[in-house]
Amino acid sequence: LGLTPFTEGIVAMRVKGTTADASMETLFSDILVFPVTPYTTESPKLWIPGNYAAASGYGADWAPQDPLTPYIEAVEFGSTAYEGFVYMNVPSPNFKITLEQDWDEAYGDGGTGMLDLAGGDLSVTGPGYYYIQVDTDPDGDPGTNDASWSATATSWALIGAATPNSWNDPD
């Protein structure tokens, strides 16, 4: 229909009636015009461009517009909380958090776990898989700048008959 998600639009509709008997006339109802608000099933996202992207298999460094730039997703519709895992394969990963796949609004370091649209690069301690959590408006008041973030280093391993070390400790 070409309508924008979460924005009210106008739809015109009519019903077409037919039968299996080709000799019967096709009938159409009157056209009805009414407002609708479409929704999307796609979760809101935040992108994580940085100096680690190319070395980690995500495309170009510092390129939020790159379709391979990693992103994290909202935990549910209407939430300002986002989470996801990002692999960073450089000794000193630096990055920003963008609201879209561009640099128009990019969160940087606002000091101890806080985000600021005018802040410098965010960083983590070294290479690895990080569980990144962001809340763009934890107090629910868009008039306050209280956006926050955290990154937790994670360690993953698989064991079982399908792995080279079988059921033994993977370390």
Residues covered by each model-derived region:
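Insoluble glucan recognition modules
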Residues: 1-171
